[in-house]
Amino acid sequence: MRIKQSEFIISAVKPHQYPIDHRNEVAFVGRSNVGKSSLINSLTNRKKLAKVSGTPGKTRLINFFLINNDFYLVDLPGYGYAKVSKSEKDTWGKTIETYLSHREELKRIVCLVDSRHKPTGDDIMMYEWAKHFGYDVVVVATKSDKLKNAEFKKSEKLIRETLNLTKDDKLYFYSSLNKKGTEELIDKLFLEFATDID
């Protein structure tokens, strides 16, 4: 499929602010600075659709983007940034938890991890939480352009072991810089929710 149209719809904190048109939703979640906004912009081929912040942890809202007038891509606040207060972290955590635990329209969670590093405790907790509640979960390892060819297998092994992924669990490597495999990744993440698959 091709993403022909992508549109920012609303930023939300509370459930009453979420869209009410019952379209399917695919949520992106990951720690601050994992490259979530860059990935969204790359997949949609829109340089400024999701704001890329130079300050980790600045995105505090749930952002809903309508894709091909068909389904929502949902950008969740980044977690794990050390330089914010505990109360702010708690607030972000509750915002994410409220959305993930009560959203019938949510069909898939895309967990982002940094391909260069071992997944953090927060990454593990988020992945296990998503699996526990029965969501279809896809792991995308970002910034793969930073890896040498010989490092891919080592990185994949480390991520799979740390997150306790099975052979059937989905893990994809992606670079927003070189965009290799963009079409394949779009299909893997969104195709089953699309009505226009051209």
UniProtKB/Swiss-Prot annotation:
GO BP, sorted A to Z: division septum assembly
Key words of the record: Cell cycle, Cell division, GTP-binding, Magnesium, Metal-binding, Nucleotide-binding, Septation
InterPro entries linked: G_ENGB_dom, GTP-bd, GTP-bd_ribosome_bio_YsxC, P-loop_NTPase
Stored Pfam families: MMR_HSR1
Cofactor(s) essential for the protein: Mg(2+)
Residues involved in GTP binding: 30-37, 57-61, 75-78, 142-145, 174-176
Residues the entry annotates as binding Mg(2+): S37, T59
Single GO term (MF): metal ion binding
Cleavable signal peptide: none
Superkingdom to which the source organism belongs: Bacteria
Family: Belongs to the TRAFAC class TrmE-Era-EngA-EngB-Septin-like GTPase superfamily. EngB GTPase family.
HAMAP family noted in UniProt: GTPase_EngB
Full protein name: Probable GTP-binding protein EngB
Organism: Clostridium botulinum (strain Eklund 17B / Type B)
Primary gene name: engB
